[in-house]
């Protein structure tokens, strides 16, 4: 293994002293950017047009990092964070910025990254935005059992740490779920097995509210009865996930969460997607609906068109595309998601789509689905779709819609599309995670004639 010299951070007293910095912009991770002795300094928590007091914590050759100590001259975009856990929880790192300011920053950062790293400039479309608070339909809470007090707490991980920050509510979680945290923690503390419980997942679905408890050993009858009683009192569905990954309803019946799409589309009846707590779903239900609607508008699927949906998951885009008449092929790398997608297609009576399991980072030349298509939809994880795009010559889609959760990989992959003769026609922000620095986007590429 190659070894490289790694310089130790400069920890001189002069560098660690508190200093004043003028912040002129944000980086794409939401940290303020200032200049100091010819270096770029990143200051999390600082905003553009602010003068702040900060302490250098890390020195590199071309940049440094600093800890915000005090805001001396605040930005007009600075607001007081509403969450009492803001300083400790690792979740909402832009709560100190107005919602309008957040979105303006994210949109500008997206355009800048695409221009800088892909040389791509497209027609910027209005951002897809929704509620700034109580937008998450799903959250995983860690459990923290204190051996001294014998009490269990629910919470989120601290920033860049495994430490659990106990919470009793959450301002970005759907209101019914946020209101459930405190009574649910009280319930868990009444269980004999409280010291051996794993994480808890809360889900707000179209068919009810769900709580999933990870258990490391079977619960006794008294504990099961307490869970069943709580479920009935609070009108929620509680299920347990065992060490084998299997799910069991506390009342003997397992109900799975469901959400609908196309329920406001005049050209089609709704589709219902069932998922298990282990499946990936977009956590912002409102934005997911508008995101799917925009993808359908851009692709304009027609009966008989062959559309390939790579990284299709359990059919979030595939089923609506098929519902509008296209012949859809969905490919996904997680076998459980493929099985769920097939079940969802069957439950919705859709026979014009086929799902395949496959490694989309591997050689795709011999895959049964590989061949000429009319249109392509990509919705990859943060790593992007670089390997899949190497097979564009065999697929030759006229249009490509790329849904991205990482602007850096989107820019890299956009360069591949541009090299293959595609032109960026539309680019827009998807504000899936308000109050955070996370940037999601949708881009439309068309093959130049």
UniProtKB/Swiss-Prot annotation:
| The protein, known as | 23S rRNA (uracil(1939)-C(5))-methyltransferase RlmD
Q: What Enzyme Commission number(s) apply to this enzyme? A: 2.1.1.190
Q: Which GO terms describe its molecular function?
A: 4 iron, 4 sulfur cluster binding; iron ion binding; RNA binding; rRNA (uridine-C5-)-methyltransferase activity
Keyword terms of this UniProt record = 4Fe-4S, Iron, Iron-sulfur, Metal-binding, Methyltransferase, rRNA processing, S-adenosyl-L-methionine, Transferase
- Purpose of the protein: Catalyzes the formation of 5-methyl-uridine at position 1939 (m5U1939) in 23S rRNA.
Question: Where is the catalytic site?
Answer: 405
Entry's Gene Ontology BP terms:
rRNA base methylation
Task: Supply the PROSITE patterns for this chain.
Answer: SAM_MT_RNA_M5U, TRAM, TRMA_1, TRMA_2
Q: What class of enzyme is it?
A: transferase
Cite the TRAM domain residue spans from the record: 12-70
| Name of the gene encoding the protein in the UniProt record | rlmD
Question: Its domain of life?
Answer: Bacteria
- Please give the organism: Shewanella sp. (strain ANA-3)
Name the protein family. Answer: Belongs to the class I-like SAM-binding methyltransferase superfamily. RNA M5U methyltransferase family. RlmD subfamily.
Xref: NCBIfam families:
PRK13168.1, rumA
So where does S-adenosyl-L-methionine get bound? 282, 311, 316, 332, 359, 379
Which positions in this protein are listed as binding [4Fe-4S] cluster? 83, 89, 92, 170
Q: Does the keyword Calcium apply?
A: no
Give the InterPro entries listed for this entry.
Answer: 23S_rRNA_MeTrfase_RlmD, MeTrfase_TrmA_AS, MeTrfase_TrmA_CS, NA-bd_OB-fold, SAM-dependent_MTases_sf, TRAM_dom, U5_MeTrfase_fam
- Could you tell me what reaction this enzyme catalyses? uridine(1939) in 23S rRNA + S-adenosyl-L-methionine = 5-methyluridine(1939) in 23S rRNA + S-adenosyl-L-homocysteine + H(+)
From which residue to which does the signal peptide run? none
